[in-house]
């Protein structure tokens, strides 16, 4: 395999040079033996994607189904109920047991992720808990060697506000210790009086 990284930060395109969800190895899309998609950080930022359901609506081969207050993803006729974070699975609601574990809509804000890898089709050969429909893997941002900081603010109708701050860099002169912090604050109103929600996320 080519010695390449799966990270998409500072990559100004909507394409990634590699992904690892299929085999656990950083393979280029051409080397990957399955149908795959990658939602890069550039696309997340350019299109203002803030949650997993919105990202999956923009992903080829994935159908987003919302019913009774829950969100589920469908791929090749099967529900994808194992959503990975850095390659580690987290069960969402509607799994084989039928127990409501976690709604996919409630997954962490996408501002903390570098990219989202999507594999269409079974991955059980390389992952013990693979599903026939496919696998979704959200890869988190990592600390950088060089200092960098960014902040953004958005405003919309019905008192909708969103603020994101991201700071990263080395913590010592030898650059052997690094850190990163991402903070998000969301506030959403409604056309109805006294209806709204406010949420915050901190990652570091």
Tell what function each PLM region has:
Residues 1-146:
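Acidic, small-polar-rich N-terminal luminal/periplasmic segments of exported/outer-membrane proteins
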Residues 98, 102, 111-114, 120, ...:
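Outer-membrane beta-barrel translocator/receptor signature
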């Amino acid at each position: 395999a080519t010695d390449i990284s799966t990270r998409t930060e500072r990559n100004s395109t909507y394409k990634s040079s590699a992904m690892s969800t299929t085999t656990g190895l950083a393979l280029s899309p051409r080397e990957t033996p399955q149908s795959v998609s990658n939602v890069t950080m550039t696309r997340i930022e350019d299109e203002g994607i803030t949650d997993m359901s919105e990202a999956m609506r923009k992903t080829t081969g994935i159908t987003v189904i919302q019913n009774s207050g829950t969100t589920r993803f469908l791929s090749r006729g099967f529900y994808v109920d194992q959503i990975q974070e850095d390659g580690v699975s987290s069960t969402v609601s509607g799994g084989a047991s039928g127990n409501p574990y976690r709604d996919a809509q409630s997954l962490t804000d996408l501002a903390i992720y570098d990219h989202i890898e999507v594999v269409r089709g079974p991955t059980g050969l390389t992952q013990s808990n693979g599903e026939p429909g496919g696998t979704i893997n959200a890869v988190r941002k990592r600390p950088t060697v060089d200092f960098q900081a960014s902040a953004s603010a958005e405003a919309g109708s019905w008192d909708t506000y969103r603020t994101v701050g991201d700071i990263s860099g080395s913590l010592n002169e030898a650059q052997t210790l690094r850190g990163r912090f991402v903070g998000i604050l969301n506030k959403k109103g409604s056309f109805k009086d006294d209806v709204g929600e406010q949420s915050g996320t901190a990652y570091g």
